[in-house]
UniProtKB/Swiss-Prot annotation:
The keyword Protease does not apply. Pfam families: rRNA_processing (PF08524). It comes from Yarrowia lipolytica (strain CLIB 122 / E 150). Residues 19-29, 37-48 have a biased composition (Basic residues). This is rRNA-processing protein FYV7. The gene is FYV7.
């Protein structure tokens, strides 16, 4: 029984606590899956370009993103990748030749256009920043007097002592007294003027004729003035 149990453990039976069989070759299965996907992708690309050629359409040319690499680095990379299978190597070569047509990689002309556009944007930004830094012709640097005044205005004010506060309070009281007296004098003059006007009107309204009858002319003038107002 013990030998059978050990045998099941060696075979990877999970019932006896051993490692499941489907996890023993997980790394190999992953490699096979990657190779299969690369082969399928290369076949799809090859069939697509064959179809374009058959229909007479132009085949887009894509530069490899590794075209600018040095030959030494390319040879070293080829030596390191010698362990890979022929199918994966062929698919990778197709991907490099097509420049990642299905992967969304940019071609050489598109990359140049993007680089030119980025250079133009940088030049525009530099020109704008230079224009901002240039002073306007109308603006002039402040003079020494202006700088001195600005410095004096920015200085914190010193607190007033008792004598200065008393003088300021006295000045304010004197100013308020003068304003109050001026207002009183103005009101007095207005009242006197109104009294004179009223007395004059009363005198005109009390005028009579030789026979003692009230004179109608001032009364009519008063009514007309009220209507005009």
């Amino acid at each position: 029984m013990a030998q059978e149990k050990n045998q099941h453990k060696r075979q990877g039976n999970s019932f006896y606590g051993g490692r499941p069989r489907h996890t023993q070759n997980r790394h190999k299965a992953k490699l096979d899956e990657i190779k299969k996907s690369l082969t399928h992708r290369s076949n799809v690309k090859r069939n697509y370009f064959k179809m374009l050629k058959k229909e007479g359409l132009s085949i887009p040319e894509r530069e490899s993103k590794f075209s600018e690499d040095k030959p030494e680095t390319v040879e070293k990379a080829e030596d390191e990748s010698g362990d890979e299978s022929e199918g994966s190597a062929g698919s990778e070569e197709d991907e490099e030749q097509q420049g990642g047509f299905f992967e969304g990689e940019a071609s050489g002309s598109e990359a140049d256009d993007l680089e030119d556009g980025s250079d133009d944007d940088e030049k525009d930004k530099e020109d704008q920043s230079a224009k901002r830094r240039k002073p306007l012709p109308d603006q002039q640097p402040p003079t020494k007097q202006q700088l001195r005044e600005m410095h004096e205005s920015q200085k914190p004010r010193k607190p007033m002592n008792f004598k200065e506060r008393a003088a300021l309070a006295k000045e304010r009281k004197q100013k308020a007294r003068e304003e109050r007296e001026a207002q009183i004098q103005k009101n007095k003059e207005d009242r006197e003027r109104k009294l004179k006007k009223r007395a004059k009107l009363t005198k005109q309204m009390t005028k009579t004729t030789r026979t003692g009858q009230p004179l109608m002319t001032p009364r009519i003038n008063k009514i007309l003035d009220q209507l005009k107002q």
